[in-house]
Amino acid sequence: MDLKQYVSEVQDWPKEGVDFKDITTIMDNGEAYGYATDQIVEFAREKEVDIVVGPEARGFIIGCPVAYSMGIGFAPVRKEGKLPREVIRYEYDLEYGTNVLTMHKDAIKPGQRVLITDDLLATGGTIEATIKLVEELGGIVVGIAFIIELKYLHGIDKLDGYDVLSLISYDE
């Protein structure tokens, strides 16, 4: 299935000059959403994944159906102040400022094989931070899966040494 046909492109959103790739049109088509999920599940099975991790919010949308299909758990990565129990945190730089991601301290057991999921790979900052959290807890990142990769932003460079699946790629 050509998933690219289900992606909506929105010009100048969220700001002028940005060509936004909207995956909600994949999600609202059961066949396309199921196909995308199945492709990631196949990748995860090959990696013998124990748990799926995803950053809010679209990492949840991609990762939860994968975890459910495999009969394994899902661990959320959230912005600071959104998780109720004891957390670890990772602060990283944005173009203008910083961001902090957190994860429950007991979300990953040492040695667990982890698949990280998100909707889109752009600059790679969010996924790089997610990797740091997983590895701090002793998890082993065995795969990272995206619906879309924006190759022209070179986010993949931050994921060197990790096995990455992107279902759709945009070169420009």
Swiss-Prot record:
One of its GO terms (cellular component) is cytoplasm. GO terms for molecular function: adenine binding; adenine phosphoribosyltransferase activity; AMP binding. InterPro entries: Ade_phspho_trans, PRibTrfase_dom, PRTase-like, UPRTase/APRTase. It catalyses: AMP + diphosphate = 5-phospho-alpha-D-ribose 1-diphosphate + adenine. CDD domains: PRTases_typeI. Catalyzes a salvage reaction resulting in the formation of AMP, that is energically less costly than de novo synthesis. NCBIfam families: apt (TIGR01090), PRK02304.1-2 (NF002633), PRK02304.1-3 (NF002634), PRK02304.1-5 (NF002636). This is Adenine phosphoribosyltransferase. It comes from Staphylococcus carnosus (strain TM300).
